[in-house]
């Protein structure tokens, strides 16, 4: 089956049922060490994960690690430009769950990004990025502890799909010509809304299937959270891109109010129900007026539409959601993308799960990570219905490779996500406690140590791993 790698002789495969992992007590898990500082951070991560599993389960559970290759290390073994060998793809497909360090961006043609390639090959449609603050972590924000969100980013669509042509290419010029002449010609009504002939051009596909499976997974996650965190916010720019980002929002609401009707309430529904609870005799029109402050300035047709919305909500879900019962449901709302960038800074404790498309999610997850301490502490997972890959969210930092100084927190916390995904919560909790206590005691690597006041003597990467284990208790 494999050309240059050999699986462990002990251990079992993780399988999947209805999109969820079925995990044996001794799973085989492929790992990619990673390029650059992967040589430092992976050994530290493996040591912490193994120690947590051993302590939590007293030998009843154990991970059998399976070394596979990608990036520069793969080229060293498999040959030039073999950044993502078939052996590695076969192993991840066979064993279902994998973890990896940072990977270099390939030079030359072919694969544009190894991370994107893995997501597309295995249909890992949900990029999951928790952003929470660990006490003692230096942050430029006054109250970083108020931010505790999970970004659910659609991973396989949007402009990141990579369907684009450079300026001057034959196909690009042809496409622009067809669009200008046949689909968006200048008209007296709309004027000249055309693409300049010297443009590069890309395509932004957003599908109903892709949008709804992402929102479905986000809502399922929300249902596992404490009641005060059961909220999913659909982040979009639908006010401008109505048929892509606006459709994402609409499809998200459609999924929530059909497939999860008894478990969810939309923000507008909550307003309608609350108005009725505060004033049982409120008229449909007055209820509509309260949920839409500009109601009286609307056209008669628009007024009738909102009144009908109020009537439909009360007739359909008052019995199941009224009299305060909606407060026990997962709240589904939406926010414009540029607004949410402000609100995670000014009103961070109002949000929990942020579900969004690929490009917005890339920006948003990095911005949120910066608030709580940066990408060095930012974990990530790419999850599909029959595979999951957990990863460092930072780059390879080759100038620090082999110096035993880089912060392994991102990969360690990605390992925590992996353990939680597997249902091994006890081991995950040990690591979170150990990491939190180490940071609170200023036992940190150089990237955090230099920002503390007063500065402290930094730990090596390997020493930070030892400190985490020591604080398991």
Swiss-Prot record:
Cofactor list: Mg(2+); Mn(2+)
Cofactor binding note of this UniProt entry: Binds 1 Mg(2+) or Mn(2+) ion per subunit. Mn(2+) is the most effective divalent cation in vitro, but the enzyme can also use Mg(2+), Co(2+) and Ni(2+), with lower efficiency.
Activity: how regulated: Inhibited by either oxaloacetate or glyoxylate. Also inhibited by the adenine nucleotides AMP, ADP and ATP and by NADPH, which inhibits the activity by 28% when it is added to the assay mixture at 0.25 mM.
Role this protein plays: Catalyzes the oxidative decarboxylation of isocitrate to 2-oxoglutarate and carbon dioxide with the concomitant reduction of NADP(+).
Family affiliation: Belongs to the isocitrate and isopropylmalate dehydrogenases family.
Assembly mode: Homodimer.
Name recorded for this polypeptide: Isocitrate dehydrogenase [NADP]
Source organism of the structure: Nostoc sp. (strain PCC 7120 / SAG 25.82 / UTEX 2576)
């Amino acid at each position: 089956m494999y050309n240059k790698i050999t699986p462990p002789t002990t251990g079992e495969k993780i399988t999947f049922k209805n999109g969820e992992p079925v995990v044996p007590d001794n799973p085989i898990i492929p790992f990619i060490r990673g390029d650059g500082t992967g040589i430092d951070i992976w050994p530290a991560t493996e040591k912490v994960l193994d120690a947590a599993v051993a302590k939590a389960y007293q030998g009843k559970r154990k991970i059998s690690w399976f070394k596979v290759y990608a990036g520069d290390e793969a080229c060293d073994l498999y040959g030039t430009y073999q950044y993502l060998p078939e052996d590695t793809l076969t192993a991840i497909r066979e064993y279902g769950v994998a973890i990896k360090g940072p990977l270099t961006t390939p030079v030359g043609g072919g694969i544009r990004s190894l991370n994107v390639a893995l997501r597309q090959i295995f249909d890992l449609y949900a990029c999951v990025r928790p952003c929470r603050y660990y006490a003692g972590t230096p942050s430029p924000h006054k109250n970083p502890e108020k931010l505790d969100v999970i970004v659910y980013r659609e991973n396989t669509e949007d402009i990141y799909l990579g369907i684009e042509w450079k300026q001057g290419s034959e196909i690009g010029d042809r496409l622009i010509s067809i669009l200008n002449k046949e689909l968006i010609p200048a008209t007296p009504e709309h004027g000249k809304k055309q693409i300049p002939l010297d443009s590069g051009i890309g395509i932004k596909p957003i599908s109903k299937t892709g949008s709804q499976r992402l929102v479905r997974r986000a809502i399922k996650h929300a249902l596992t959270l404490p009641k005060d965190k059961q909220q999913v916010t659909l982040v979009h720019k639908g006010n401008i891109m109505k048929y892509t980002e606006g459709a994402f929002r609409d499809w998200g609401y459609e999924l929530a109010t059909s497939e999860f009707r008894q478990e969810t309430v939309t923000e507008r529904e909550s307003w309608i129900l609350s108005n009725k609870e505060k004033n049982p005799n409120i008229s449909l029109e007055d209820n509509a007026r309260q949920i839409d402050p500009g109601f009286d300035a609307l056209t008669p047709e628009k007024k009738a539409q909102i009144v009908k919305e109020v009537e439909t909500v009360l007739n359909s879900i008052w019995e199941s959601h009224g009299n305060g019962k909606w407060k026990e449901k997962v709240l589904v709302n939406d926010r414009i993308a540029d607004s949410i960038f402000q609100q995670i800074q000014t009103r961070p404790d109002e949000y929990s799960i942020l579900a969004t498309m690929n490009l917005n999610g890339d920006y948003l997850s990095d911005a949120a990570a910066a608030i709580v301490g940066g990408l060095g502490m930012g974990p990530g997972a790419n999850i599909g219905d029959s595979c999951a890959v957990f990863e460092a969210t930072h780059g390879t930092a080759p100038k620090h490779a082999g110096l035993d100084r880089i912060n392994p927190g991102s990969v360690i916390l990605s390992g925590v996500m992996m353990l939680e995904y597997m249902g091994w919560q006890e081991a995950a909790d040990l690591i979170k406690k150990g990491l939190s206590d180490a940071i609170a005691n200023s036992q940190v690597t150089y990237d955090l140590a230099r920002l503390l006041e007063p500065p402290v003597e930094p730990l090596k990467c390997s020493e930070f791993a030892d400190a985490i284990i020591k604080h398991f208790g």
